[in-house]
Amino acid sequence: MSLSKEVPSFRWTQSLRRELSSYTQQTKTLVLKDAKMIADSLDFNQVSQVQRVLRKAKRSDADLDKLRDLNQEVDKLMVMKSVQKNTILKLGDLGKDELMDLATDLEKLKRKIGDSGRDGPRPYMGNLTQSQLDKRTQILRVLGFQQQTGVSRGVVRLWDVSNPAKLNNQFGSMPALTIACMTVQGGETMNNVVQALTSLGLLYTVKYPNLEDLEKLTQEHDCLQIITRDESAVNISGYNFSLSAAVKAGASLIDGGNMLETIRVTPNNFSSIIKATLTAKRKENMFVDERPGNRNPYENLLYKVCLSGEGWPYIGSRSQINGRSWDNTSVDLNPKPDPGPRAPEKNGQNLRLSNLTEMQEAVIKEAMQKLDPTNTIWMDIEGPPTDPVELAVFQPTSGYYFHCFRKPHDEKGFKNGSRHSHGILLKDLEDAQPGLLSYILGLLPQNIVITTQGADDIRKLLDVHGRKDIKLVDVRLTNEQSRIFEQQVWERYNSLCRAHNGVIVPKKKNKESNIQKEPHCALLDCIMFQSVLDGHLPDTSLKPLLPDNLVHQAKPAFVM
C-alpha cells in the first residue's frame, strides 16, 4: 500500500469503535473513584515540581526520577491500571495470516516509534554525541536553516538520561489524573470539571474536537480555560493540560458511544481484541505508516493493546510496565502440538486449564469414557460461541450428560443475552469452575459426530477450541417444532438446571411471532430436541457425569 495514501482518521476511529464495541465498558464510576482518591491524597506540590520539570528544554536523570516517583504515587492510588503481562500468540489463538499480519505491523511500529524514540518528525541523529548534535544545530542556525522539527509550534524536549529505557511508559494522560489536576489546580469543583469534559466526550463521538471547538465550549464551561491552546510537546505527561488529555477524559465519562478509551484487556479476551482489530483493519484498508509522525488510530490502538495483556490500555496507569508493545506481545508461527483428545487450542476466550487440579482432570477423563461415540450425542450452548456461558453434552440412550457453566468476559453482551434468551444471572456464575468448559471440549473423542439444533455456533465453538475433527449433524427443526415439548421438559427436569432465574423479555421485533416465555437452558434444550425426534420424553433416567462440587467451586465459609 502506498504510504502517501491519506488516512481517513476519524472514519478509522469509528470503524474500530464498531468492531470492538463488545469490549468497551462503562468506566465513569471507576474513573471518578480514582480521580477523587488522587485529588484527596496526592501531594500537588510534588505535581507542580514535575510540571516545572516538563517545561524545561533539557531534563536530567534527577528530573526523570521525580517524574517516575510521582507516577508511582499515582499508580498506588488508582484502581484502573495496566500490569506487566507479556503474551505470546500462537496458531490457534489467531490464524496464520492474522499472526503474520500482526507480526509485520508490530515490526513496523517498532521502526516508527522505537527507532525514533518519539512520536513526531525529527532530524536524523545517527550515532552523533549530544555535543556534536548541539554543534550541528548551531551551524544550521548560522547558515539560516530552520530547526527541522517538522512541527510548527510543537517543542522537542530533550531527556539527557543515562538509561533511556526508564522513559518507557512514564508518559501519556490518564482521565482520573486529568480530572484531579483540573479540579485541584484549577480551583474547580469536580462536578464542574466532569460536566465540561463530558461535553468534549460527546463531541468526540462525532468528530475530533479541535481548538475552535474548545474555545466555544469554554464559553459554556469556564473550567476549560486551563486546557493549553498549544500543540502538544513530545513526550507529554499526564500532568499537562492538553486538549487530547481532556478529550480522552471526556470519552471515559460518557458511558456510551463504544469509545475505544473504555476497552479493558484481560488474558481471556486479548486475542479476540487483536482479531477484531485486524478485522477492522482489513475492512477499512488500515495500515502502519512507518514515516515519522503521530500515530494513526489503528497504530495507536495496536500499540496500546499490545503493551500489556491485562489492564486499561488507554486510560489506566501503565507506569508498572517494562518494555514496549513489540517486547510484550510476540508471535510464534510454529504450530501448537496436536492436543489429541485432551487439551484444546486457545482462542483467547477460554479460561485457563491450570485452574483444574490433577484430581479434577482425572475425574473428567473417567467421566468422558462413559460416552458412547457410536450413539447420538447432543451439544448445545448458551451465549455466543466466542464467549459461551453454558455447555451441555447429552447422550439420550444412556441418559449421561455433561453440564457446566462459565463466567463471561463480555458482561454487556451477557446481560443482553440473559434478558432475551437464557435468563442466567451473573451472580449465579460466580462459582462456575474456571477451565471446565474448555477441558470438556478438548477431551471429546476424536472424529466424534455431534447432533445439534443449529450447527453454526457449535461449529465456531469447536473451531475456536481446535476441534475441527469433530463432525456435526444439524437436525434443522423449525422454532415451533423445537419447542413442542418445552413445558413438559421444564416441568419434569427443572431441578437439573437452577441457574436460569432471570425474567425473559421478548425483543420488540419478535412480538408478533411465538414468544418464548421460558429461558433457554442448554441441557433442557438438548432433552426437548431429542423428545421431538422420539415423540416423547426420555425413558431413561438422566445422570450427571460430573459431581456438583466439580462443576461449581466451593464457596468460602464465613468465619466469625
From Swiss-Prot:
<keyword id="KW-0899">Viral immunoevasion</keyword>
<dbReference type="GO" id="GO:1990904">
    <property type="term" value="C:ribonucleoprotein complex"/>
</dbReference>
<dbReference type="GO" id="GO:0016787">
    <property type="term" value="F:hydrolase activity"/>
</dbReference>
<feature type="binding site">
    <location>
        <position position="525"/>
    </location>
    <ligand>
        <name>Mn(2+)</name>
    </ligand>
</feature>
<keyword id="KW-0946">Virion</keyword>
<keyword id="KW-0167">Capsid protein</keyword>
<dbReference type="GO" id="GO:0046872">
    <property type="term" value="F:metal ion binding"/>
</dbReference>
<dbReference type="GO" id="GO:0039724">
    <property type="term" value="P:symbiont-mediated suppression of host cytoplasmic pattern recognition receptor signaling pathway via inhibition of IKBKE activity"/>
</dbReference>
<keyword id="KW-1035">Host cytoplasm</keyword>
<dbReference type="GO" id="GO:0039689">
    <property type="term" value="P:negative stranded viral RNA replication"/>
</dbReference>
<protein>
    <recommendedName>
        <fullName>Nucleoprotein</fullName>
        <ecNumber>3.1.13.-</ecNumber>
    </recommendedName>
</protein>
<keyword id="KW-0862">Zinc</keyword>
<dbReference type="GO" id="GO:0039696">
    <property type="term" value="P:RNA-templated viral transcription"/>
</dbReference>
<keyword id="KW-1113">Inhibition of host RLR pathway by virus</keyword>
<feature type="binding site">
    <location>
        <position position="497"/>
    </location>
    <ligand>
        <name>Zn(2+)</name>
    </ligand>
</feature>
<keyword id="KW-0479">Metal-binding</keyword>
<comment type="subunit">
    <text>Homomultimerizes to form the nucleocapsid. Binds to viral genomic RNA. Interacts with glycoprotein G2. Interacts with protein Z; this interaction probably directs the encapsidated genome to budding sites. Interacts with protein L; this interaction does not interfere with Z-L interaction. Interacts with host IKBKE (via Protein kinase domain); the interaction inhibits IKBKE kinase activity.</text>
</comment>
<feature type="binding site">
    <location>
        <position position="382"/>
    </location>
    <ligand>
        <name>Mn(2+)</name>
    </ligand>
</feature>
<keyword id="KW-0945">Host-virus interaction</keyword>
<dbReference type="InterPro" id="IPR012337">
    <property type="entry name" value="RNaseH-like_sf"/>
</dbReference>
<feature type="binding site">
    <location>
        <position position="500"/>
    </location>
    <ligand>
        <name>Zn(2+)</name>
    </ligand>
</feature>
<feature type="binding site">
    <location>
        <position position="380"/>
    </location>
    <ligand>
        <name>Mn(2+)</name>
    </ligand>
</feature>
<feature type="compositionally biased region" description="Polar residues">
    <location>
        <begin position="323"/>
        <end position="332"/>
    </location>
</feature>
<feature type="site" description="Important for exonuclease activity">
    <location>
        <position position="457"/>
    </location>
</feature>
<keyword id="KW-0543">Viral nucleoprotein</keyword>
<dbReference type="GO" id="GO:0019029">
    <property type="term" value="C:helical viral capsid"/>
</dbReference>
<dbReference type="Pfam" id="PF00843">
    <property type="entry name" value="Arena_nucleocap"/>
</dbReference>
<keyword id="KW-0378">Hydrolase</keyword>
<keyword id="KW-1139">Helical capsid protein</keyword>
<dbReference type="InterPro" id="IPR038115">
    <property type="entry name" value="Nucleocapsid_C_sf"/>
</dbReference>
<dbReference type="GO" id="GO:0019013">
    <property type="term" value="C:viral nucleocapsid"/>
</dbReference>
<feature type="region of interest" description="Disordered">
    <location>
        <begin position="323"/>
        <end position="349"/>
    </location>
</feature>
<dbReference type="GO" id="GO:0030430">
    <property type="term" value="C:host cell cytoplasm"/>
</dbReference>
<keyword id="KW-0694">RNA-binding</keyword>
<keyword id="KW-1090">Inhibition of host innate immune response by virus</keyword>
<keyword id="KW-0687">Ribonucleoprotein</keyword>
<keyword id="KW-0464">Manganese</keyword>
<comment type="function">
    <text>Encapsidates the genome, protecting it from nucleases. The encapsidated genomic RNA is termed the nucleocapsid (NC). Serves as template for viral transcription and replication. The increased presence of protein N in host cell does not seem to trigger the switch from transcription to replication as observed in other negative strain RNA viruses.</text>
</comment>
<dbReference type="InterPro" id="IPR035084">
    <property type="entry name" value="Nucleocapsid_C_arenaviridae"/>
</dbReference>
<feature type="region of interest" description="Binding site for the cap structure m7GTP">
    <location>
        <begin position="54"/>
        <end position="236"/>
    </location>
</feature>
<feature type="binding site">
    <location>
        <position position="521"/>
    </location>
    <ligand>
        <name>Zn(2+)</name>
    </ligand>
</feature>
<comment type="similarity">
    <text>Belongs to the arenaviridae nucleocapsid protein family.</text>
</comment>
